[in-house]
Swiss-Prot record:
This protein's UniProt keywords: Disulfide bond, Glycoprotein, Immunoglobulin domain, Repeat
GO biological process: antibacterial humoral response; complement activation, classical pathway
GO molecular function: antigen binding; immunoglobulin receptor binding
SUPFAM superfamilies per the UniProt record, alphabetical: Immunoglobulin (SSF48726)
Intrachain disulfide bonds: C27-C82, C136-C196, C242-C300
Gene Ontology cellular component annotations, sorted alphabetically: immunoglobulin complex, circulating
InterPro entries for the chain: Ig-like_dom, Ig-like_dom_sf, Ig-like_fold, Ig_C1-set, Immune_Resp_Modulators
Protein name: Ig gamma-2A chain C region
Keyword Ligase in record: no
Length: 322
């Protein structure tokens, strides 16, 4: 896929606001490739009440939403701007969120709800003992009309196995409702389409959101482990690195073990598109120098659908004299 700059749309409630109420404003960042984009509010000056949802990949392009909750008095007295940066396309967009003019027909007095659908976690999809779930989230539900009904479809056939949680009250006095659909691993890997349909008395019409696995032939990664650089051995903490390259789609899970025990002190870079259209990432495990020098075995473990049995791992340990 080619590098594509995002389109940025402001999201504002279409209702008259009470002076003492909280208001949630949003920014829709649509149709970009590759990851990542960064979203800040008022160039970082607004940081509390910010929620940026994970990006969703559909038809080869990513879409992401970020929201910020502020007192309505703040919104009416000062500008609220979302700042979007997409390094891959050298794009920077500042979008001011302005109150929508209320026409007499359009103002019902109810909040404007938004619906988001999220893919299952990669680890859940590729581990037979875990249960992958597609998740549908509705935000900004008015307490005046809190009933929300979820319907789920797999390839347009309705299913009734979803687990819908009780609505949760948010800091801006609206409600948030979540429905999770447990799915069969193979259905996701085979590219079936999962659709969430949300209905409410407050909606003029049902809202539908769909998601499926990115199209294209899976390619398994090559995995390489690298010992701490010699120059780093003067420090008390050293880095063990795992390079994972040549994989598609970008959905992958990488973790570390020491002597077979899971470790937590590691960080992964996001999957990044390489020049050939495949993806690569680096994973860095931090350990004490003595832990490395004692000859413990460190293993980089990778889950990806293009691998045999969806799994591979590479180990290394310190050898005296190296």
């Amino acid at each position: 896929a080619e590098t594509t700059a995002p389109s940025v749309y402001p999201l504002a409630p279409g209702t008259a606001l009470k002076s003492n109420s909280m208001v949630t404003l949003g920014c829709l960042v649509k149709g970009y490739f590759p990851e990542p984009v960064t979203v800040t509010w008022n160039s970082g000056a607004l940081s509390s009440g910010v929620h940026t949802f994970p990006a969703v990949l559909q038809s080869g392009l990513y879409t992401l939403t970020s929201s910020v909750t502020v007192p309505s008095s703040t919104w009416s007295s000062q500008a609220v701007t979302c700042n979007v940066a997409h390094p891959a396309s050298s794009t920077k967009v500042d979008k001011k969120i302005v109150p929508r003019e209320c026409n007499p027909c359009g103002c019902t007095g109810s909040e404007v709800s938004s619906v988001f659908i999220f893919p299952p976690k990669t680890k859940d999809v590729l581990t037979i003992t875990l249960t992958p779930k597609v998740t549908c989230v509705v935000v900004d539900i008015s307490q005046n009309d809190p009933e929300v009904r979820f319907s789920w479809f797999i390839d347009d056939v309705e299913v009734h196995t979803a687990q819908t949680h009780a609505p949760e009250k948010q800091s801006n006095s609206t409600l948030r409702s979540v429905s999770e659909l447990p799915i069969v691993h193979r259905d996701w890997l085979n590219g079936k389409t999962f659709k969430c349909k949300v209905n409410s008395g407050a909606f003029p019409a049902p809202i539908e959101k769909s998601i499926s696995k990115p199209e294209g032939t899976p390619r398994g990664p090559q995995v390489y482990t690298m010992a701490p650089p010699k120059e780093e051995m003067t420090q008390s903490q050293v880095s063990i690195t795992c390079m994972v390259k040549g994989f598609y789609p970008p959905d992958i899970y990488t973790e570390w073990k020491m002597n077979g025990q899971p470790q937590e002190n590691y960080k992964n870079t996001p999957p990044t598109m390489d020049t050939d259209g495949s993806y690569f990432l680096y994973s860095k495990l931090n350990v004490k120098k003595e832990t490395w020098q004692q000859g413990n075995t460190f293993t980089c473990s990778v889950l990806h659908e293009g691998l045999h049995n969806h799994h591979t791992e590479k180990s290394l340990s310190h050898s005296p004299g190296k």
